[in-house]
């Protein structure tokens, strides 16, 4: 297999680090890790310091020149800039997608004959998809949707934005259920089902599989991920995340006074 370069936008998050760990297992994969804080990334994954297969791009997502350098000649781009906190007015996913679209448009305009567009793989959620969440009890889905309402609205708008580019950009929408920081057990992609809790490592492996699929059967599709060798452990931080998220949904003025960085542990 010829060498492939993968860009990971949101490298310091649980999904971003899991993507890098999985990609490092593939000898011919090169990684462009985009982050705001290089020391934080190296603290999480110190092996990157000496790796000649990883290039770290430190900066804001609005740095057009840096982002173009990160995306140039990539096989796939993983859009995993997100938050577990239900922040009122959240637009992290929208900002990332908008910046990526603009950067790729600029690359294409500057090199119209030689620029090959990468596949974009967006981390979304099964809660936003009626098909993938059809087996979730209605009351639970009601609670889950409101506990991350601002984040989900951001994702819904982002998906529409990416769908609007389908004449020149291919996107894939990965929509897992509950996520957990746990070991890798085995996964399968599904267009009809999701199964949680799912480990971030299994999620990352599924995202890479979708990006590498060559027949195009996953292009512009929403995909769930199911466990194939047992579920991940229960994410202990999730109950607090749901509670605080509900408070932010119903009482957004409390946002500055509520804890941050809640979510799966």
UniProtKB/Swiss-Prot annotation:
SUPFAM superfamilies: NAD(P)-binding Rossmann-fold domains (SSF51735). The keyword Ribosomal protein does not apply. It is an enzyme of class 1 (oxidoreductase). The keyword Transcription regulation does not apply. It comes from the Eukaryota. Pathway: Secondary metabolite biosynthesis. Its EC number is 1.-.-.-. InterPro entries: NAD(P)-bd_dom, NAD(P)-bd_dom_sf. GO terms for molecular function: monooxygenase activity. Pfam families: NAD_binding_10. Keywords: Monooxygenase, Oxidoreductase. Oxidoreductase; part of the gene cluster that mediates the biosynthesis of the tetrahydroxanthone dimer neosartorin, which exhibits antibacterial activity. The two different monomeric units appear to be synthesized by the same set of enzymes, among which the Baeyer-Villiger monooxygenase nsrF is the key enzyme for the divergence of the biosynthetic routes. The pathway begins with the synthesis of atrochrysone thioester by the polyketide synthase nsrB. The atrochrysone carboxyl ACP thioesterase nsrC then breaks the thioester bond and releases the atrochrysone carboxylic acid from AacuL. Belongs to the avfA family. This is Oxidoreductase nsrR. The lineage of its organism: Eukaryota, Fungi, Dikarya, Ascomycota, Pezizomycotina. The gene is nsrR.
């Amino acid at each position: 297999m010829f060498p492939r370069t993968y860009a990971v936008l949101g490298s310091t998050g649980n999904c971003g680090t899991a993507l890098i760990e999985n990609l490092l297992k593939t000898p011919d994969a090169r990684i462009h890790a985009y982050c705001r804080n290089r020391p934080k990334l190296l603290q999480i994954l110190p092996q990157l310091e000496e790796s000649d297969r990883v290039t770290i791009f430190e900066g804001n997502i609005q740095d057009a020149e840096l982002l173009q350098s990160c995306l140039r000649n990539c096989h796939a781009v993983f859009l995993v800039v997100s938050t577990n906190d239900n922040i009122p007015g959240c637009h992290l996913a929208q900002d990332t997608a908008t910046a990526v679209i603009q950067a790729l448009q600029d690359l294409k305009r500057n090199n119209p004959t030689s620029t090959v567009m990468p596949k974009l793989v967006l981390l979304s959620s099964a809660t936003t998809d009626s098909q993938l969440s059809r087996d979730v009890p209605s009351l639970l889905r009601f609670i889950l949707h409101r506990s991350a309402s601002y984040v989900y609205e951001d994702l819904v708008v982002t998906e529409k934005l990416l769908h609007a580019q389908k004449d020149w950009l291919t996107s894939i929408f990965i929509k897992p259920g509950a996520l957990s920081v746990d070991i890798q057990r085995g996964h399968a992609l599904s267009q009809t089902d999701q199964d949680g809790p799912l480990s971030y490592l299994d999620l990352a492996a599924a995202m890479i599989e979708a990006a590498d699929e060559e027949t195009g059967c996953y292009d512009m599709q929403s995909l769930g991920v199911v466990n194939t060798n047992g579920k991940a452990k229960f994410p202990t931080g999730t109950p607090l995340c749901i509670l605080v998220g509900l408070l932010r949904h119903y009482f957004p003025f409390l946002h500055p006074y509520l804890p941050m960085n809640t979510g799966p542990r």
